Amino acid sequence: QARNVSLVRDVIQEEDAGVRSRTVEITRDGKKHLFGVIEIPSFYFDYRSRRAGTEYRSVSEDTAKAFESLKAKKVEGVLVDLRNDPGGSLEEVARMLGQVIKSGPVVQIRDGNGNVNVFEDTDGGEQIYAGPMAVLVNLASASASEIYSAAIQDYERGIIIGSTTTGKGTAQVQLDSLAHGQATLTQRKFYQIGRASCRERVFAG
């Protein structure tokens, strides 16, 4: 006999989709060199858990731990891998850039009315990692990935390696309080500190 069963889908926690780090040893001219690699799948931030007042994950905290771990292993440089990273939280990319630069603006956001909001490094000059670094990108690196790469380039903090990026250039606002779910609206464009739109200027190594 057939019957109807109602199921409510819970939030899926993608535990394997967080920041990962590792070391790579390279031998050159008979001398061994140790480098670090940090893989960032997206600029994630658990807004729901933060609003609920419970423990939450964020890419900036996970990346900070990765930098500290690699520093303890005395790596000679770090490669930040942003390949296939579609982007994510603007606040998180600003926090992450604060880990590798001393201070300053990191991106400009302009809305349809011409209002400009500048996101800055707000950690008071604290720099978790000051060593040599590079950023690896590809065609699927978009949005926050491009903001991160652009700021690294603007501050001459490291080199950009890889293919041309997406060139997305737009930012979204998420509405969570709708009666039947959520909606994401594209309302803004983001610009490098040098005023170039990332839709007009994509990044390639």
Role assignments for model-derived ranges:
Residues 36-38, 184-185, 199:
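Short hydrophobic-aromatic micro-motifs
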Residues 1-178, 193:
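Cleft-lining beta-strand/loop regions that shape enzyme active-site pockets
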Residues 192-204:
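Residue-level detector of conserved catalytic or cofactor/ligand-binding positions
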Residues 177-189:
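Short acidic, Pro/Gly- and aromatic-enriched capping/linker segments at domain boundaries
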